[in-house]
Each structure stands twice: as structure tokens, then as C-alpha cells.
Amino acid sequence: MSKPSILTQILDAVRAVDSKVTALQTQVDQLVEDSKTLEALTDQLGELDNKVSDIQSMLSVEEELPEPPAPAPEPELPEIPDVPGLRRSRKQ
């Protein structure tokens, strides 16, 4: 058998490099997609953090409100004097 020519060897090397470049390009494309997903996730987490902060602010405002005033005591009813000859109701 004859030895492969130098051009054949170069062609084989170029094909091997091309195959490796294609594999690397596939990985880079996947990394780009993953980074877009991470950016979207980062945005969502930022929005969630803002909402949680808003809720915490609302809850802390309620805690800072003054206590409502105590209800006014009911006035005491005056004593009804006993009047001779008058019957009182038993409902009292």
C-alpha cells in the first residue's frame, strides 16, 4: 500500500478539527440558551423580591398603627327608689 498523500492527511486533519468545532459550537449555542434562561429567571426573582418587599411594607404599616381607643364605658343606670304600692317587673 502506498502512503497517503500529504493532501489526504491535511484533509483528514481538517475534518477532525471541523468535527470538534461543530461540537464546541453546539455547546456554545446551548450555553447561550441557558444564559437567556438564567437572565429571565433573574428578572423573575427580582420581580418576586419587589412583591415580597411590598407585602412586608404593608404588614409593617399595620403594626405601626396606633391602638384603637378603648370603648367608652356604659353609663350606669340610676337606682330606682322603692315607691310604696308600686310593683316592679320581675325582668330586672
Swiss-Prot record:
Transmembrane domains' residue ranges: none
Residues covered by region (Disordered): 60-92
Alphabetically ordered keywords of this record: Late protein, Viral occlusion body
Lineage: superkingdom: Viruses
Gene3D superfamilies the record matches: Designed single chain three-helix bundle
GO annotation, cellular component aspect: viral occlusion body
UniProt cross-references to InterPro entries, sorted A to Z: NPV_P10
Family: Belongs to the baculoviridae p10 family.
Described purpose of this protein according to its UniProt entry: Seems to be involved in the morphogenesis of the polyhedra. Forms extensive fibrillar structures in both nucleus and cytoplasm. It is involved in the liberation of polyhedra from infected-insect cell.
Descriptive protein name: Protein p10
Source organism (scientific name): Orgyia pseudotsugata multicapsid polyhedrosis virus
